[in-house]
Every structure is written in C-alpha cells, then in structure tokens.
Amino acid sequence: MELHILEHRVRVLSIARPGLWLYTHPLIKLLFLPCRSRCKFFSLTETPEDYTLMVDEEGFKELPPSEFLQVAEATWLVMNVSHSGSVVQAAGVTKIARSVIAPLAEHHVSVLMLSTYQTDFILVREQDLSVVIHTLAQEFQIYREVGGEPVPVTGDDSSNGFPQIQHGPSPTVHPIQSPQNRFCVLTLDPETLPAVATTLIDVLFYSHSVPKEAASGGPESTSIPFFAFSLIEGYISIVMDAEIQRKFPSDLLLTSSSGELWRMVRIGGQPLGFDECGIVAQIAGPLAAVDISAYYISTFNFDHALVPEDEIGCVIDILQRRQESQASKDP
C-alpha cells in the first residue's frame, strides 16, 4: 500500500451559527468560484452547533477574523492511502483502521478524518509528521507531493530518538448517539455545479427545516441538521439527509449503483478538542473487526461516523458493549 502526503496545508475553523451571515459571501466564492481564490482543499460541514471549515491556506485568506470565527491553532497536513490490487474491502475508514488509525493512536498522534465519496483523507498536525512517517514507514511506501509530483519518503532519517510505545491510561471512551436521519453520500460533476447552486445556497445558508436540537440523551436521538460539502482537487462530495436530497435535481446527483443509505453515530458528549488521541480508533477498530463499512467526518466539536442503514443496530450494540467493558475496567 502507498501513503501519500499531499501538498495541502489545512486550517480547521468553526463559524458560529449566529455569525454565518458574515461569511456567506466568502463561502459562496469558495464553493462556486474556486479559481478566483486558488483554493484546492475546501470542506464545509453543518452541524447542530456550528459550521466546520477545513480549508487550505489560500481558502483561509478569504475568511475575515471575527468574534464568530474560531481557528484551531495547528496547521494540518493531509494524507490518503492508495490500495493496490482489486481486493474488495469494507468502504471508508474501516479499511485503514488497522494499518493507519490504530498505529497512530498507539503513538499518541491526534488525527482528524474527512471521508468523501471518492476517498478518505487523514489529517495530522504538521508538527507530528516525523512521528507519522516513523510509525507507518514499515507498512507503507510513503510519498510526499512536491510541486504536484510524488517524491518517495523513507523513515530512515526519523528512526532514531523515538521511544518505544508507552502504554498509558486507556483513552476516554466517549458517549455515542444515533440521530434518526437517513443520509446519502453523493458526488456531482463540477461542470453541473451551477445548475444546483441556488438549491445548495438555500440548503446551506437559509433553510433549516430539520430540528436543531443537538443529539443528546439516549443513543436514539431526534434528527439533527447535518450537511457536508467538499470540493477537493476538483472533486465534489456531498453528505446530506435523504429528505434534503429531494430538493435537488435527481439526474445531477450521482451515487453508488446500490443507492445505499447511511445512519450516523455521533461521538462525544461534550466538545472533543484536538489534543486527544484514539478517538477515531475507538470507532474504526471495532467496526473493522466485524467488517462494517464506515465513512468518518471529524468536525470542530464532535466526530461523526456513517454506517450502512441496515447495520446501525449492530454498530450501536458493538460500541455500547465496548463502553460498558471500558467502564468496568476503570477504577
């Protein structure tokens, strides 16, 4: 397998809902006129709490500072995995759970995930790159993009001075909830983006028909507002509620031949922050063990896994049993 470290240097931001009006113009520019901003990595995710943005440095320049904008301190580098051969595996984050997510958690590297229709992006802090290379060099051929060209990276230069894995206290097992929404994962030909622009602007900025209550209480919670749009290196990916999809022209949105619907597992009872390690691993690992596909989208406050609709009961059971098992071990 190959691990590619892409050229994007990404910032992670949160726009408070009351301040969205201040950012409507720059967001529309990034959504529909990327050539004017030279932004190559743009992701916008609406959650009950806020709007999370992941943008490269060119996109970041478009966003004025304000009291409504929070910016995570770190600059994040973007990686993805290329699988050689045609072995059919579970989709999404599940297929990299053992090879990438678990080893990085063991070496105390905090990761963010952004699954799209096309691929899964792994974001790591720029300052952690040497640890990432050292950790994954035996498992992967690692390449770093320089000027658009992949340049081989070896772990030899970073192999000294790294201690053995220190097994500290078990990571916090965060509570989970499952909103009632049914989601679809879609793509769109960028050339047809203008044809859905009006609907997309309405859904993102003006239409909030889904209840705004955060997923709180029991594991089965009410529906929540959640909409994820990414435009990365010319490829579009959209995650939306199946009810919202009906607002769009059906002939322009593309999905897999099965037309599979997905349910959400929302991770975190309170904002997760960016320093804790192993959050993705505690979800991806158990699902990989039973070969259940999962898309995974990290946001500024909480994490979100999308699993096949017919597997949601099994997934909730697996993750709750893990919670109970961990709780029984804690003093």
From Swiss-Prot:
Post-translational note: Phosphorylation at Ser-14 by AKT1, promoting the interaction between CASTOR1 and RNF167.
InterPro entries membership: ACT-like_dom_sf, CASTOR1_ACT-like, CASTOR1_N, CASTOR_ACT_dom, CASTOR_fam, CASTOR_mTORC1
Annotated keywords: Cytoplasm, Phosphoprotein, Ubl conjugation
Family of the protein in this entry: Belongs to the GATS family.
Keyword Phosphoprotein found: yes
GO cellular component: cytosol; GATOR2 complex
Lineage: Eukaryota, Metazoa, Chordata, Craniata, Vertebrata
Pfam families: ACT_7 (PF13840), CASTOR1_ACT-like (PF21389), Castor1_N (PF18700)
Residues of the ACT domain: 72-137, 259-320
Subunit structure: Forms homodimers and heterodimers with CASTOR2. Interacts with the GATOR2 complex which is composed of MIOS, SEC13, SEH1L, WDR24 and WDR59; the interaction is negatively regulated by arginine. Interacts with TM4SF5; the interaction is positively regulated by leucine and is negatively regulated by arginine.
Gene for this chain: Castor1
Subcellular location: Cytoplasm, Cytosol
Binding-site residues, L-arginine: S110, V111, G273, I279, V280, T299, F300, N301, F302, D303
Example GO molecular function: identical protein binding
Gene Ontology BP terms: cellular response to amino acid starvation; cellular response to L-arginine; negative regulation of TORC1 signaling; positive regulation of TORC1 signaling
Organism: Mus musculus
Ubl conjugation is among the record's keywords: yes
Name recorded for this polypeptide: Cytosolic arginine sensor for mTORC1 subunit 1
Primary subcellular site in the record, as a coarse category: cytoplasm
Function: Functions as an intracellular arginine sensor within the amino acid-sensing branch of the TORC1 signaling pathway. As a homodimer or a heterodimer with CASTOR2, binds and inhibits the GATOR subcomplex GATOR2 and thereby mTORC1. Binding of arginine to CASTOR1 allosterically disrupts the interaction of CASTOR1-containing dimers with GATOR2 which can in turn activate mTORC1 and the TORC1 signaling pathway.
Sites of Phosphoserine modification: S14
Domain notes: Based on x-ray crystallography data, the protein would be constituted of 4 tandem ACT domains instead of the 2 predicted from the sequence.
